[in-house]
């Protein structure tokens, strides 16, 4: 009883922080003519309510795709339609065709913020609570502390409740998928993940680990027996879920192709705005977007992404395990973020979710990563006038992690899960005994750099010739951190050893 009482308190704390952040500004507030993501979500409600399904993704006089045209999968459109019905009941002006463009009011802001909170309460928060309750080999207090830290992760809160999006829906479905598959409810887990992909196509960042883990399970059961039966069942679940979600768009071939064109807009280029990945960072020194043809950029990003995630995926197929699955989710999502085509700064949330799932296993490194992921979105958060909420939520999260996990005491090679790797290296370099000390120093350098860059960005004006100087520096520093983490997580995956300390797993 006490466990559920404390878990309820944790959820209430998470909800309080979320609602407090929601009282602040949002993307594009009072900034015509395009406004921002808040207006995009409102506009999708307008379009889905007033136009027939076959016109949702097509350009027309009633649906100007240049003005926040719908570019997410059908499940997002259905969610927008559901919200639109509620909006119509409260105030029809909020979704009136054409005349509602750029609509802003306190009442409408309250409505929009409430829709995010309800989605969070229905999908993401229950998944977090159940995940933490199912963790093995840790005390009840640690499970509750784990839930608190995950629910206080500032990146997701600031984007969903500040900037304004519904990332908790797709991430929540993905987490339900992780829960299902880790608990051997493979069909339910696959269904949940299919819903995640059909809500936001960026969930494809997680698709390969799901595929490889399930394929590994099938191989382990034997493809001539139970494994083959499981494979057929999984294929049926995936096909059926996609067919049901896409059914209204399968009536005509052009309908399906148009939706796909909207979901994967190759013509937008290698990257947009300032994002902390390889291509944006490297573009500072060599203008890749201007020098290389579009098709070469596509091939280059595909090959880089594929090669960077291949080792972890092969290992997961050959040795499927719950622990390996979670770490491969991190590695693959980070590879996609760093190397893939058309990445947005908010896509780092797709990496942050699986990092949250290993928070209790490697608290020091997970906390560090989650701090960097929030920092990497600083230019966007400043643009939305969310500096104060960013600072407060980041400090609250950091304090929660420090007090819950004593992260500064968890920096030994064993606690960092680098013991097997260090032993392997010491066979050739016996003096290699300082790895944990190096990581501690790197953490200090990283945190100091982030603090200094934040202060510089807020207090100093950039040179006139370099107006984006601080934004570029934030992205570059974040990218360096992410490259380090990519190496680190792949080391854990490739050097995973049974001789290491017992890992907390979901049964």
Swiss-Prot record:
Enzyme class: transferase
Subcellular localization: Endoplasmic reticulum membrane
One GO-annotated biological process of the protein: protein N-linked glycosylation
Membrane topology, record value: Multi-pass membrane protein
Pfam families noted in UniProt: Alg6_Alg8 (PF03155)
Catalytic activity: an alpha-D-Man-(1->2)-alpha-D-Man-(1->2)-alpha-D-Man-(1->3)-[alpha-D-Man-(1->2)-alpha-D-Man-(1->3)-[alpha-D-Man-(1->2)-alpha-D-Man-(1->6)]-alpha-D-Man-(1->6)]-beta-D-Man-(1->4)-beta-D-GlcNAc-(1->4)-alpha-D-GlcNAc-diphospho-di-trans,poly-cis-dolichol + a di-trans,poly-cis-dolichyl beta-D-glucosyl phosphate = an alpha-D-Glc-(1->3)-alpha-D-Man-(1->2)-alpha-D-Man-(1->2)-alpha-D-Man-(1->3)-[alpha-D-Man-(1->2)-alpha-D-Man-(1->3)-[alpha-D-Man-(1->2)-alpha-D-Man-(1->6)]-alpha-D-Man-(1->6)]-beta-D-Man-(1->4)-beta-D-GlcNAc-(1->4)-alpha-D-GlcNAc-diphospho-di-trans,poly-cis-dolichol + a di-trans,poly-cis-dolichyl phosphate + H(+)
EC number annotated for this UniProt entry: 2.4.1.267
Keywords: Congenital disorder of glycosylation, Disease variant, Endoplasmic reticulum, Glycoprotein, Glycosyltransferase, Membrane, Transferase, Transmembrane, Transmembrane helix
Cytoplasmic side: 1-3, 136-143, 194-226, 319-323, 383-387, 459-472
Alphabetized InterPro entries for the sequence: Glyco_trans_ALG6/ALG8
Stretches that traverse the bilayer: 4-24, 115-135, 144-164, 173-193, 227-247, 298-318, 324-344, 362-382, 388-408, 438-458, 473-493
Involved pathway(s): Protein modification; protein glycosylation
Residues with glycosylation annotation: 59
Lumenal side: 25-114, 165-172, 248-297, 345-361, 409-437, 494-507
Clinical condition linked: Congenital disorder of glycosylation 1C: A form of congenital disorder of glycosylation, a multisystem disorder caused by a defect in glycoprotein biosynthesis and characterized by under-glycosylated serum glycoproteins. Congenital disorders of glycosylation result in a wide variety of clinical features, such as defects in the nervous system development, psychomotor retardation, dysmorphic features, hypotonia, coagulation disorders, and immunodeficiency.
Record's function text: Dolichyl pyrophosphate Man9GlcNAc2 alpha-1,3-glucosyltransferase that operates in the biosynthetic pathway of dolichol-linked oligosaccharides, the glycan precursors employed in protein asparagine (N)-glycosylation. The assembly of dolichol-linked oligosaccharides begins on the cytosolic side of the endoplasmic reticulum membrane and finishes in its lumen. The sequential addition of sugars to dolichol pyrophosphate produces dolichol-linked oligosaccharides containing fourteen sugars, including two GlcNAcs, nine mannoses and three glucoses.
Protein name: Dolichyl pyrophosphate Man9GlcNAc2 alpha-1,3-glucosyltransferase
Native source organism of the sequence: Homo sapiens (Human)
Gene assigned in the entry: ALG6
